[in-house]
Amino acid sequence: MGQKVNPTGIRLGYIKDWSSRWFADSKSYPVFLNNDLKVREFLKQKLKHASVSRIQINRLANNAQITIHTARPGIVIGKRGEDIDALRRDVSRFMGVPVQVSVEEIRKPELDAQLVAEGVAQQLEKRIMFRRAMKRAVQNTLRVGAEGIKISVAGRLNGAEIARTEWYREGRVPLHTFRADIDYGFAEAVTTYGVIGVKVWIFKGEVFEPVHTEPKTRSAVEA
């Protein structure tokens, strides 16, 4: 039985970039990695209402740069930048080095798999039927220009005694094509019956278009 690899991880270094960019020796590596995980967990909890999709961390010699990708930058920045200044101080104290925090707005949150997954999870927590939530997310994503989307939900759906997996797909989602720009997101819906996992794959198109060579004319071949 085949298992699906993480679409982002398998494309790292090809068409996807790492979420943490730094170099460390064997002693510092686990410290930096653990620190990155804690920083992301802290920011996700702090900005849970800001629709944060991903957090990029760049470590330099004596400081760090953090980029927050969010669909609601106003909540992150706050009035006159007060919230982001407080956030910068907290993260700097957390990491032990000066930190520069920047915010990038996600123009089309319907094309972001992580935000779509979190949106479906929030609807499931509000006791909305899972099929209705899935179809609504699929329609919104295809409307803004996606070439394909697949949504999978797993758990005690609608309070059933036996957990099961249901999925819905429209368009193309070529998981085996490395040049395919596939965004992947995962979220959990905490319901009274248990936790329901939500996975989303969004196909945005191919990064490298195939090269079409023009056929040689007869005169050029003879020459």
Curated annotation (Swiss-Prot):
This protein's record includes keyword rRNA-binding: yes
MF GO annotations: mRNA binding; rRNA binding; structural constituent of ribosome
The entry's keywords: Ribonucleoprotein, Ribosomal protein, RNA-binding, rRNA-binding
Keyword rRNA-binding: yes
Top-rank taxon, per record: Bacteria
Domain KH type-2: 39-107
GO cellular component: a single term: cytosolic small ribosomal subunit
Entry-linked SMART domains: KH
InterPro entries named among the record's database cross-references: KH_dom, KH_dom-like_a/b, KH_dom_type_2, KH_sf_prok-type, Ribosomal_S3_C_sf, Ribosomal_uS3_bac-typ, Ribosomal_uS3_C, Ribosomal_uS3_CS
GO biological process, one term: translation
Pfam families linked: KH_2, Ribosomal_S3_C
NCBIfam families in the record: rpsC_bact
Function (record text): Binds the lower part of the 30S subunit head. Binds mRNA in the 70S ribosome, positioning it for translation.
PANTHER family: 30S/40S RIBOSOMAL PROTEIN S3 (PTHR11760), SMALL RIBOSOMAL SUBUNIT PROTEIN US3C (PTHR11760:SF19)
Family: Belongs to the universal ribosomal protein uS3 family.
Assembly, per entry: Part of the 30S ribosomal subunit. Forms a tight complex with proteins S10 and S14.
Name of the molecule in the record: Small ribosomal subunit protein uS3
Gene: rpsC
